[in-house]
Amino acid sequence: MGKGCKVVICGLLSVGKTAILEQLLYGNHTIGMEDCETLEDVYMASVETDRGVKEQLHLYDTRGLQKGVELPKHYFSFADGFVLVYSVNNLESFQRVELLKKEIDKFKDKKEVAIVVLGNKLDLSEQRQVDADVAQQWARSEKVKLWEVTVTDRRTLIEPFTLLASKLSQPQSKSSFPLPGRKNKGNSNPEN
């Protein structure tokens, strides 16, 4: 099992961040349950990666962002990964995800943080405000993976978190710098 990675779940108020986590982890979220505002909760999950290794995730369920309110900066300093959540029936929530991605890029080097995007409330697609093709095109241009999901179908939630855990548990790449006390490969003559 890995060291434990910190993943921040963020998005506008009422896009379903807590519902996603409760359905993913416990399989017991009730649709239509009265919304109660989250201050911040931390969930622990052991997620199997695509390599069969279990990765421990600390999932930070953040307070829903409101208009004009930014994600607190301390999240950028400790997060190993982000799950950006919008609602397919709320264009403003998608626009906020676009801004969050820019903020993450500004505060973290893209190469060291894993990001997945979830378009939630797919079951409300008749009220859709976010075009699926436009969202996927944006995700490709930002080099992030985007899924449209619904808490009514827990299976739609598993793949994004499996991919995230897999990205977070990838083995470190080997350094190209020679280590002290070792000879450089391919250079048997130190005089050259």
Swiss-Prot record:
Q: Where is this region: Interactions with NFKBIA and NFKBIB?
A: 58-93
Keyword annotations for this protein?
A: Cytoplasm, GTP-binding, Nucleotide-binding
Q: Give the InterPro entries listed for this entry.
A: KBRS, P-loop_NTPase, Small_GTP-bd, Small_GTPase
Q: Where is this region: Disordered?
A: 168-192
- Record-level GO BP terms: lung alveolus development; negative regulation of canonical NF-kappaB signal transduction; Ral protein signal transduction; regulation of tumor necrosis factor-mediated signaling pathway; surfactant homeostasis
Q: What is the residue range of the motif Effector region?
A: 35-43
Cell location: Cytoplasm
Q: Does the keyword DNA damage apply?
A: no
Function summary: Atypical Ras-like protein that acts as a potent regulator of NF-kappa-B activity by preventing the degradation of NF-kappa-B inhibitor beta (NFKBIB) by most signals, explaining why NFKBIB is more resistant to degradation. May act by blocking phosphorylation of NFKBIB and mediating cytoplasmic retention of p65/RELA NF-kappa-B subunit. It is unclear whether it acts as a GTPase. Both GTP- and GDP-bound forms block phosphorylation of NFKBIB.
Describe the protein's quaternary organization and the partners it interacts with.
Interacts with both NF-kappa-B inhibitor alpha (NFKBIA) and beta (NFKBIB) in vitro. However, it probably only interacts with NFKBIB in vivo. Forms a complex with NFKBIB and NF-kappa-B heterodimer (p50/NFKB1 and p65/RELA). Also interacts with c-Rel (REL).
Please state which protein family the record places this protein in. Belongs to the small GTPase superfamily. Ras family. KappaB-Ras subfamily.
What the entry says about domains is: In contrast to other members of the Ras family, the members of the KappaB-Ras subfamily do not contain the conserved Gly and Gln residues in positions 13 and 65, which are replaced by Leu residues, and are therefore similar to the constitutively active forms of oncogenic forms of Ras. This suggests that members of this family are clearly different from other small GTPases proteins.
Please report the name of this protein according to its UniProt entry: NF-kappa-B inhibitor-interacting Ras-like protein 1
Q: Which organism is it from?
A: Mus musculus (Mouse)
